[in-house]
Amino acid sequence: MNGMVAAPQPVAAEEGVLALRRGGNAVDAAVTAALVQGVVDPLNCGIGGLGGMQIYRAESGEGIFVDFFSSVGAQATPDLWVDQILGPAVDGVGFILRGDLNEIGYQSIGTPATVRALSGALSRYGTWSWEEALAPAIAWARKGYPIPAELARDWRVPYAEG
């Protein structure tokens, strides 16, 4: 299959390309790359995060969005923290709240959906088994990998707001 794979860390992209070379389709490659990315750069793309996957099925012209955004508790409402907002986060993602309510404590917890969504996308639109897609990530976790400079820096810096 012709194709290309993009990922923040080269090793993840390379594993996605290998998935294509081994006969996998685009979803097999994307899931494989995502799982490897979660191992080699866990602060940016880990299985505890959130996101989405867009799939285009050329044979049917169908566009599909696989949602893996975290779920919150049943008592959460859209205006839950409106009166607690101090301002936008320095990095432009989200907001800083009084008492770090969205970062620390029980109210900050969302149920990650990444594993469920990747597994579901693979079983519905892929051709590989979960075990085949997960194998490269397991291999990288076992043998180790070079830590990117940004990750090493993040691990050394104490928590700061925003």
Each model region followed by its residue ranges:
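Noncatalytic scaffold domains of N-terminal-nucleophile
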Residues: 1-14, 18-21, 26-162
